Amino acid sequence: MDPNCSCAAGGSCTCAGSCKCKDCRCTSCKKSCCSCCPAGCARCAQGCICKGASDKCSCCA
């Protein structure tokens, strides 16, 4: 569990734009969990690797 997030990994949570999770794995999280992921990335919470400061990452390219 992310110490900055009150939800269990892979569970549902109330994360929104104000989510402070640094490594959120919530399936219901609507926030872009990676700084490079677009908000609509459905696989964001499955653990992506960012490729620099662009909008591309390993799961949302």
Curated annotation (Swiss-Prot):
GO CC terms: cytoplasm; nucleus
Gene that encodes it: MT2B
SUPFAM superfamilies: Metallothionein
Chain sites annotated for binding a divalent metal cation 1: C5, C7, C21, C24
Domain notes: Class I metallothioneins contain 2 metal-binding domains: four divalent ions are chelated within cluster A of the alpha domain and are coordinated via cysteinyl thiolate bridges to 11 cysteine ligands. Cluster B, the corresponding region within the beta domain, can ligate three divalent ions to 9 cysteines.
Family per record: Belongs to the metallothionein superfamily. Type 1 family.
Modified residues annotated as N-acetylmethionine in this record: M1
Keyword field: Acetylation, Metal-binding, Metal-thiolate cluster
Secretion signal span: none
Subunit field text: Monomer.
UniProt GO MF annotations: metal ion binding; zinc ion binding
Residues where a divalent metal cation 4 binds: C33, C34, C44, C48
Transmembrane stretches, start-end: none
Residue segments, region Beta: 1-29
Residues binding a divalent metal cation 7, per UniProt: C50, C57, C59, C60
Reported function: Metallothioneins have a high content of cysteine residues that bind various heavy metals; these proteins are transcriptionally regulated by both heavy metals and glucocorticoids.
Sequence segments annotated as region (Alpha): 30-61
Name of the featured protein: Metallothionein-2B
